[in-house]
Amino acid sequence: MDDLQEIMEDFLIEAFEMNEQLDQDLVELEHNPEDLDLLNRIFRVAHTIKGSSSFLNLNILTHLTHNMEDVLNRARKGEIKITPDIMDVVLRSIDLMKTLLVTIRDTGSDTNNGKENEIEEAVKQLQAITSQNLESAKERTTEAPQKENKEETKEEAKEENKENKAKAPTAENTSSDNPLADEPDLDYANMSAEEVEAEIERLLNKRQEADKERRAQKKQEAKPKQEVTPTKETPKAPKTETKAKAKADTEENKAPSIGVEQTVRVDVRRLDHLMNLIGELVLGKNRLIRIYSDVEERYDGEKFLEELNQVVSSISAVTTDLQLAVMKTRMQPVGKVFNKFPRMVRDLSRELGKSIELIIEGEETELDKSIVEEIGDPLIHIIRNSCDHGIEPLEERRKLNKPETGKVQLSAYNEGNHIVIKISDDGKGLDPVMLKEKAIEKGVISERDAEGMSDREAFNLIFKPGFSTAKVVSNVSGRGVGMDVVKTNIEKLNGIIEIDSEVGVGTTQKLKIPLTLAIIQALLVGVQEEYYAIPLSSVLETVRISQDEIYTVDGKSVLRLRDEVLSLVRLSDIFKVDAILESNSDVYVVIIGLADQKIGVIVDYLIGQEEVVIKSLGYYLKNTRGIAGATVRGDGKITLIVDVGAMMDMAKSIKVNITTLMNESENTKSKNSPSDYIVLAIDDSSTDRAIIRKCLKPLGITLLEATNGLEGLEMLKNGDKIPDAILVDIEMPKMDGYTFASEVRKYNKFKNLPLIAVTSRVTKTDRMRGVESGMTEYITKPYSGEYLTTVVKRSIKLEGDQS
C-alpha cells in the first residue's frame, strides 16, 4: 500500500507539472492549428495522464482523458481542424481534468468531485466531435490518391495499434505499454494475505522497472526523430548529420544515469523551515558583529582581536553565502503565474467579443516562491481591466484606425533587489478629467481636491475603494472592487504600483516588488526609546538640517531640498511616541520615496544600516497599521519594521507645525525665576515629604509630590513639563526606587534627568545597585537641610543664594 501511495504522489506531481504549460499550449494551438509538434506535446499530456490514471483505477479521470485523447489524436491525423468552438470543449475538459486532479490530491479518489454531470456532458461533446469528424475523414480518404491512401492507412494502423495497446492490452502487445499483461491469472481467493501482499509488491516493482525503461527509450528516440526532417531539407551535409546523431546517441545512452542524480524534489515545508533557520543564523551573525565591536572598543590594540576579526568575518561571509543559496532554492520563474494568462485572455476575448493578443516577455525572471503565489490575483485583476476597460470594441478600433486586434503586453525583469512587472495595453487610456469627475460624483474627493490634483494623482483614483469607470456592471468588472484590493495586496508584499497613461494611446501599470520577503536591508532609526527599521529600498537619502531650513506652508511644515519642496512629518507623530525637539540642535530627516511620492520623516537619531529578518507580529497584532513586522537587532533589542506605504498614508492626515513645537520647547526651557524650576519628591512617608518640603521652601522652587514609584512614573510621563530633578525613596509600595529609576532610564528624553536617592540604605551593595539602576546622587537619611538644598541646587543648576 505504501508503494501504491508513492506512485500516486509521483503521478500527481507529474500531472500538475504538465498542466502548468497546458493552457498556454492550447491557446497557441488555436492560433497555429498546423503546428504538429505542439499538437503532439498536448496529446502526450492527455495520453500520459490517461495511462497513469488507468493503472491507479481512477476511472472517471481515465474516461475523460481517453475521450480527450481521441479528439487530439484525430487532430494529429488531420481529421479534425481545431476551431474556436472545438477548443472551447477541449479547454472545458482540461478544467474538469484539473478539478479531478485536485480532488484526487485532497481525497485520494476521483469520485465525489461534485462535477459528475459536467464531466458526462463534456465527454458527450468530445465523443460528438470525434464521431462527426471521423465520418468526414472517411469521405476525404476515399477521394484521395491511392498512394496517399496507403500511407494514411499505415499511419492509422500505427496509431490504432498504440490505442489498442492502451485500451485493451493482450498477450501479443504487452512489451511496452502493459508489462503486466503476460502475467498468469492467479487465484487470489485461495492465497494468504502475506502471499497476496508479496505478489502485489512484485507486480508494482515490475511496473516501475518497465516505466523506467519506457522513459529511457523515449529519451533515446526523441532526438533522432527530430533530426529526420532537416536531413531531407539539407541533403548536402549528411556527414555532419551523422556525427551529430552519433554524438546524440552516445549522450542519450549516458543521460538516464546522470539525469536522475541532478535534481531531487524537496517538500516546500522543509525549505520554509530551512529559511527560518537561516533567518535565526543572520540574527546571530548580527549579534556576533555587535559583540565584536564592543570587545574591539574595550580591548583596543590587543593581539587576539586580529584572530577574532578573521573568525567573525569568515562566519559573516559563510552565513551570507548560505543565505543566498537557500534563497535561490526558493526562487521560481514568474512564468508559473504568467502561463495561465493566455487562456484567461482568450476566454475574455470571446466573452467580450473583442480580438485581443497577449504578449509575454521575461517569464524566466525568478522570484521568491511565496511572492509568486501572492502576485497571481493582483495580475488577474489588472489584466481583466485592461481587456475590459482598456481595449476598445472592434468597431471603435476600426473608426480610430487602430489594428483590429488589441494588444496586452505582460513583461518582467530584474531591477536591483526588485522585480518589475509591467502590464501595458494599446487601448483608449485613462482620461484624468473624467476620473476626477467620477470621483467627485461618487464622493471620493471634493472639487477643491480635484483642482490641485495632477494627472498622475488622478490615475491613482482607480485604487480608491468603490471607484469604477464602468457604465455597466458586467461579469468581468464594473463593481468598483478589485483595484483597491490590488494596491493593498501589492503593498503587503512591500511593493509599489505606478500608472502611466495617455488618452487614445494606452495604459501602462508597473509593479515593483522585492525579490524576497524573508530578509531585507533596512535603515535603523530611533525615536526616544523606540527603534524602527525602514526598508532601505524606500530610503532615498538622509539629511541633517537646522531649524532655520524648516518652513511653514498652509499650516504644515515643509523642507526645501535642492529644487524640491517636501512635506515634513515626525515619526513620533505617526506612531504616537513621545519625542523631544531641541530648538538649538539639528534634526535628522529620512527622505522616503514610494512611486512618485516623497516625504521627509524626522527622527531623533540614526543607528545605521543592518540586514534584518522579518518576523510576523502574530495573530493579534498582525494588522497594526503602519507596521509590517518586527525583528531582533544585533544588540538583542526588538525593532519594529515600518510598512512604508501605510506610513505615508498615515502621514497625510497629520498637520503639525514643527517650528511651533520647537519654539514651545524653547519657551519651556527658559528659566526666568526660581519658581520655573521643578523638583519631584517621591516618598511613601508623609513625614519625609514634609521634611523635604520645609528644606526646599527657601529656594522658591516648585515642588511636586508622589507617594510611590508608580505614581511618580505616571506623573513624569504624562506631565506637561519635565522636572529638573527627582528625589526618590528606595523602600516604597507598588514600585520601589530601583525599579522607578530603571523605568525612567528607558526613555531617551529622561536620560540626563538627575535622580537623587534619599534612603537609609548605606551599604556598598545598595549604592552599587542604585548606580546600576540609574541614580545620579545618593543622600543618606538622616540628612541636614543645608546638605539637601546644596545637592538639589547643584543638580538643577540653580545659581545664586535663594535662601
Swiss-Prot record:
GO terms for molecular function: phosphorelay sensor kinase activity. GO terms for biological process: chemotaxis. InterPro entries: Bact_Chemotaxis_CheA, CheA-like_dim, CheA-like_homodim_sf, CheW-like_dom_sf, CheW-lke_dom, CheY-like_superfamily, HATPase_C_sf, His_kinase_dom. Pfam families: CheW, H-kinase_dim, HATPase_c, Hpt, Response_reg. Residues 134-185, 209-255 are annotated as: Disordered. It is an enzyme of class 2 (transferase). Its EC number is 2.7.13.3. Residues 678-796 form the Response regulatory domain. Residues 136-166, 209-226, 233-254 have a biased composition (Basic and acidic residues). Disruption phenotype: Mutants are unable to colonize mice. Residues 519-653 form the CheW-like domain. It catalyses: ATP + protein L-histidine = ADP + protein N-phospho-L-histidine. Residues 270-517 form the Histidine kinase domain. The modification 4-aspartylphosphate is found at D729. Keywords: Kinase, Phosphoprotein, Transferase. Contains a C-terminal CheY-like regulatory domain where the phosphate can be transferred. Member of the two-component regulatory system CheAY/CheY that regulates chemotaxis and colonization of the gastric mucosa. Functions as a sensor protein kinase which is autophosphorylated at a histidine residue and transfers its phosphate group to the conserved aspartic acid residue in the regulatory domain of CheY. In turn, phosphorylated CheY (CheY-P) interacts with the flagellar motor protein FliM to cause clockwise flagellar rotation and bacterial reversals, as opposed to straight swimming when CheY is not phosphorylated. PANTHER family: CHEMOTAXIS PROTEIN CHEA, SENSOR HISTIDINE KINASE CHEA. This is Sensor histidine kinase CheAY. It comes from Helicobacter pylori (strain ATCC 700392 / 26695). The lineage of its organism: Bacteria, Pseudomonadati, Campylobacterota, Epsilonproteobacteria, Campylobacterales. The gene is cheAY.
